[in-house]
Design a protein with these regions (language model features):
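Intrinsically disordered, low-complexity regulatory segments
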Residues: 1-169, 173, 179, 467
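Short strand-coil-strand connectors
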Residues: 30-32, 226-230, 413-417, 661
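Metal- or metallocofactor-binding catalytic centers and their adjacent structured scaffolds
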Residues: 244-280, 286
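C-terminal or mid-to-C-terminal helical accessory/interaction module adjacent to the motor/catalytic core
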Residues: 87, 142-227, 269-270
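Basic, low-complexity terminal or inter-domain segments flanking catalytic cores
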Residues: 2, 81, 125, 180, ...
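Amphipathic alpha-helical transducer elements in NTP-driven molecular machines
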Residues: 9-16, 33-36, 40, 59-62, ...
Length: 695
């Protein structure tokens, strides 16, 4: 008998049908000489510190660096702490028996880092010695599964993939466990979660937040003239220069207004080619789904995974935007299939040779770019259909013609002021026709240098400089992809993918972790750090744990392990040294968390004392631990203001707060019924008496 292990029951069911394992048993299917079983994600995990006899957060125990990591069944949280998940333990026993009774194991977990780790951890935990081979496929269509089963690969071919996954798992454990314990011990109150990837990600969110909030907008003035163009159109020139002072701008405006003509000083005409966009990888799909449709990164991943399991798209957790030659041979057939769908029937043009920009064998590693499979997308929800159609539409764009334009730039001088205008004429719409999003630009007449133009009007406008906007999930994913470097070019971004922080498969969960930990929140599409997130970042922002570039280097090292260019032992020694450094650095933060008595009892429990800890005031009763963060809407509360809040339930009317839109406001800070702080505005007070909570 051979045992096939899939990552999920739904995938196991499809494989079982194809191999003839039609008899349903407890935890597996059987028949045709096969047993087809399944995991449900990670059945086995690394033991927590208490698995090594280390309990609680104790300074002398740090850093915790196990000589050998211990594997245990996945745990679930109960009122009495963590215990093995009974369903997981039961499934492990079934899998262990099947493995033992089999002559061969076929590994059919997801074909990627985590899928490999799910199987290998389980295999090692069981202590199995049965030989195994790998089913490595990029879609779950019947055709792909059958071809994969006919061409099974040696299990050891993916040893380096496993070693990279194992190194990532262990490094996250070392940094997360030791960093969190060290910082929490230093703080002396509460738990402050830090991580190898989550902390640098938070640092980027906080840095952008402060850059936005501290930006001072400046006014500027710009001049404009208008003249007749082609076919009755008006061509509007704008001054090349912008003035920071209104007076000199007005002086020049009056001269321009009085001038009777303008002279063309330069006329440039050149052909511009806009390359087709590359196909989607997961991160690019997540970015565009967030920007265009407001989907979260996690939501997009969940939908893509669902579409994959329904056989509608190829493997979603891909980091490549290219396809190999053998897959390119299937593209005409797939485009013809897309063209049969109502949404695309008028958009797909039959071509003997589709554009090859997204074709490159050398840029495809484990999995190629996202494609639809040719299975009909029936009965999809609105959200699922949106993601499916995005992938189909990108395929149509990627294999269409280039967009070609004639671009004209004209410079003219009027009353000593230089003006410019730019326009274009589309010669070949190409891929831009797919969504019809190409804006119509004004056609510039065939003016030549020395031509005289007669202005039909002039104007002066006032503008204001704007800060960089707060991060959205789309822009944060871009920043994670390039370790904070701002790169617009698709090909350059793809070349940097090994230097980013996180991976396409993990970035969504990292972002969600920051929400779950209470470090940031969503405000419409923007990501806003919370008081807790800002307080944490203020402590660690100059430390190695928050170093975005260094985290990008770790990802690069993991990619080298995967390629067989670096030993996992070398990486382990480096990460252990790094762990010792960041643990020492974080535990020395106690000077930043030094506490003093506020002189106030806790308004919530009544038994604890409220103590000042730099950025936060907290109850010293461990069963309560009420926190009050000093930073509120860009303003730090003073000791006296905090004391008013603790004793009266509210402060006096305070000035100098700043809204998320950057506007200043005045408000009272008060406790609500759950002892969360909230703003109360002057108009909310009645008869000069405050109606908020008072202890």
């Amino acid at each position: 008998m051979k045992t096939i292990i899939a990552e999920k029951p739904s995938v196991a069911r499809e494989i079982a049908r194809i191999v003839g394992a039609t008899k349903r048993e407890e935890g597996y299917f059987e028949g045709g000489g096969y047993a087809v079983t399944w995991a449900f994600g990670h059945l086995v995990q690394l033991a927590m510190p208490d698995g090594y006899g280390i309990r609680g957060f104790v300074r002398d125990n740090l850093p915790v660096i196990p000589e050998t990591f211990t594997l245990i069944p996945r745990q679930e949280k109960t009122e009495k702490g963590y215990k093995p998940d009974s369903g997981v333990v039961s499934q492990i026993k079934i899998i262990a028996r099947l493995f033992k009774e089999s002559e061969q194991i076929i590994v059919a977990t997801d074909a990627g880092r985590e899928g490999e780790l799910i199987f290998r951890y389980l295999y090692h935990y069981i202590g199995c010695t049965t030989p195994f081979v790998r089913l490595w496929i990029s879609s779950l269509t019947d055709k792909a599964i059958r071809e994969g089963l006919r061409n099974l690969e040696a299990g050891d071919k993916y040893d380096n993939l496993y070693l990279a996954a194992k190194a990532r798992s262990e490094s996250d454990w070392l940094v997360g466990i030791n960093g969190t314990q060290a910082l929490s011990i230093a703080a002396g109150h509460g738990t402050y979660s830090v991580g190898r990837v989550q902390t640098p990600t938070l640092a980027m969110v906080c840095e952008r937040y402060w850059e936005n909030r501290r930006f001072t907008s400046e006014a500027f003035w710009q001049l404009h003239i208008a003249t007749d163009g082609c076919d009755g159109e008006v061509v509007k020139f704008s001054s090349s220069e912008k003035w920071k002072e209104k007076e000199p701008a007005m002086e020049l405006y009056n001269k321009v207004k009085a001038a009777g003509c303008a002279t063309v000083t330069k006329a440039e005409r050149k052909e511009k080619t806009e390359e087709t966009p590359l196909l989607y990888d997961l991160t690019t799909l997540q970015k565009e789904a967030n920007a265009k449709h407001g989907f979260t990164a996690e939501q997009t991943l969940e939908i893509a995974q669902k579409l994959y399991e329904k056989k509608l798209i190829t493997y979603p957790r891909t980091g490549s935007r290219y396809i190999p030659e053998d897959v390119f041979a299937e593209i005409p057939k797939l485009l013809a299939f897309i063209g049969t769908q109502p949404e695309w029937k008028d958009k797909v043009r039959a071509k003997a040779a589709p554009t090859r920009r997204s074709v490159d064998d050398g840029k495809v590693t484990d999995h190629h770019a996202l494609l639809v499979t040719g299975e009909k997308p029936l009965f999809l929800s609105k959200e699922d259909n949106t993601i499916y159609q995005m992938i189909a539409g990108r395929m149509v764009e990627a294999f269409s013609e280039k967009c070609v334009k004639d671009v004209t730039t004209v410079t003219a001088e009027c009353a000593g002021v230089e003006f410019t205008v730019k326009g274009s004429v589309v010669k070949q719409t190409g891929w831009r026709a797919v969504y019809g999003e190409e804006k119509e630009e004004i056609t510039i007449p065939g003016w030549q240098e020395g031509d005289t133009l007669t202005p039909k009007g002039s104007s002066i406008t006032e503008g204001k400089t704007k800060p960089k906007p707060l991060h959205t999930e789309a822009t944060l994913l871009s920043a994670m992809e390039t370790a904070g470097k701002e790169i617009e070019d698709d090909a350059l971004r793809q070349a940097m993918k090994d230097c980013g922080i996180g991976t396409p498969a993990t970035r969504a969960s990292i972002i969600e972790t920051l929400f779950k930990r209470g470090y940031m929140e969503r405000c419409k599409k923007s990501l806003v750090p919370t008081e807790k997130g800002l307080a944490l970042n203020s402590v660690v922002k100059t430390m190695r744990i928050a170093d975005v570039a260094m985290t990008g280097e770790w990802e690069k090292e993991l990619a080298r392990i995967e390629r067989g260019e670096l030993s996992d032992d070398t990486f382990r020694k480096e990460i252990e040294a790094y762990t010792r450094e960041i643990t020492s650095e974080l535990i020395s933060c106690d000077k930043l968390f030094g506490s003093r008595d506020s002189g106030c009892a806790c308004p919530k429990c009544g038994t604890g004392r409220m103590r000042f800890y730099g950025k936060v005031v907290r109850c010293d009763n461990t069963e309560c631990g009420l926190p009050v963060f000093r930073l509120k809407a860009g303003r730090t509360l003073s000791d006296d203001e905090i004391k008013d809040l603790l004793t009266e339930g509210h402060t006096k009317l305070l000035k100098g707060f700043k809204s998320k839109q950057g506007k200043s406001f005045d408000a009272v800070v008060a406790f609500d019924g759950e002892y969360n702080t909230t703003f109360v505005f002057p108009e909310a007070k009645k008869d000069k008496k405050f109606s908020g909570r008072k202890k």
